[in-house]
Amino acid sequence: LLGQVSRSTMALIVLGLMGLDEPPAHAQTVDIDVASELALAHIVTGNTEVDDIAYAGLRGLSDTLFFRTSIEPQAPVSINLENDELALFPIIYWPITLEQPRPSVEAYAKLNTYLRSGGLIIFDTRDANVAGFGSASPNGRKLQELAKFMDIPALEPAPSDHVLTRAFYLLQDFPGRYVGRYVWVEAAPIDAQQVDGMPFRNLNDGVTPVVIGGNDWAGAWATATSGAPLLPVGRGFGGERQRELANRFGVNLLMYVLTGNYKSDQVHVPDLLERLGQ
């Protein structure tokens, strides 16, 4: 218990530093058929505009996955924390808004079970364009409030050797509509064994249970039913390049959560084989 409290406290300290053509997405009862097909999900915040963009973002990312990988997601799902099952979804996107209510005790229990069982929640404060490092933005403070009763582990800025940087595409950063200074992931244990500077990450098969940032990823992924982007990203060619990198980050996220530390294992194969021969 003390260890959990300590990890949660460390996570909250980090959080404190952070700075459409379709009917609105509404809370819904998740159909049991989702269990047999992969679908991306987002938390319904109660803000219609934010929820619509979250849905459109996951629709765009689902299309990107379909055309570029062997993953064939079905339509995204809008989930109500109080009523819907979370375990059906490998990734849940949670946009932060100031007005969304704090979950109930029962909903927090579901969230913590999800995090401990291999699920990944992407917390997006969507404010990297205005929030600077060292000053808590309003959405950052709201995230801190929402995360208070969640079993979030100790966090660190995603290191340059993190599997997220090479799960499918090779990436140096993780932009959305905005480019923030840091994206936070679970910290490697202090005593983690190092091979060529890279720690073995064994929790949940090496998958961080949370990714936290403010880059408005759904805004960059969002498409209309025609496939056209819904929101501008940057200007001209540079903006389109940023949108492409945001899409690549989305693909890496899905490949990462579905394959665990497979890419990390590949990096460590020579050392592992050497040890097996000893």
Q: Model regions: which residues?
A:
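Extracytoplasmic/secreted proteins, especially bacterial periplasmic and envelope-associated proteins
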Residues: 53-60, 64, 106, 110, ...
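Extracellular/periplasmic catalytic domains that process cell-envelope and extracellular macromolecules
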Residues: 31-35, 84-88, 107, 114-116, ...
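Structural recognition of the beta-strand scaffold that forms the well-ordered cores
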Residues: 41-42, 90-95, 120-124, 154-157, ...
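Short alpha-beta junction capping motif
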Residues: 91-140
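An acidic, glycine-rich "communication" segment
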Residues: 36-39, 129-228, 242-247, 251, ...
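N-terminal export leaders
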Residues: 1-2, 6, 10
